[in-house]
């Protein structure tokens, strides 16, 4: 296994060395970033030379909160889902299950996490990590199932749902369940679509 803070993929030349050149051109999907930017992206006046100031981050979080229908105090902007997953995993630790097959980092974010089939994930204690829709197969967990999993979390257990691809159907999001007492952490992405 790679060190948790040093590897995220995206090395197309390494993949070609390992698996052979195959039929070119290769399509690199490792970042999840749409290579076809929205029209007129160059016309946006953004300062790419420095990090955003606290007020700008608070503004981003407020806009995201409005978009997702949650209170701004429940939003924390991070520089990508990958780092967010790893940071949260380092903070909560403990026993955990992650849905397999699934996104590789879900299995690495909490050292003691164990792979579990999607239909059996709620049969065990500990925190639960899954994506909805799932990455890589697109499997969708029914809202009722996720709400049941959330209701069964308590103590130090969390439901961690990676909603990086939830923009395909906003009704999939558990954002309406976010609250001060919910043992729920959602991960959203601005870079997928």
Positions of PLM-derived features:
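N-terminal "arm"/small-domain region of PLP-dependent enzymes with the aminotransferase-like
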Residues: 1-56, 63-66
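PLP-dependent aminotransferase-like
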Residues: 8, 74, 83, 87-144
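Hydrophobic/aromatic beta-strand patches that form the interior of the parallel beta-sheet core
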Residues: 25-29, 76, 97, 160, ...
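Short glycine-rich anion-binding loops that position phosphate/pyrophosphate groups of nucleotides
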Residues: 32-38, 81, 132-136, 166, ...
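Active-site pre-lysine segment of PLP-dependent enzymes
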Residues: 63, 122-124, 139-159, 163-193
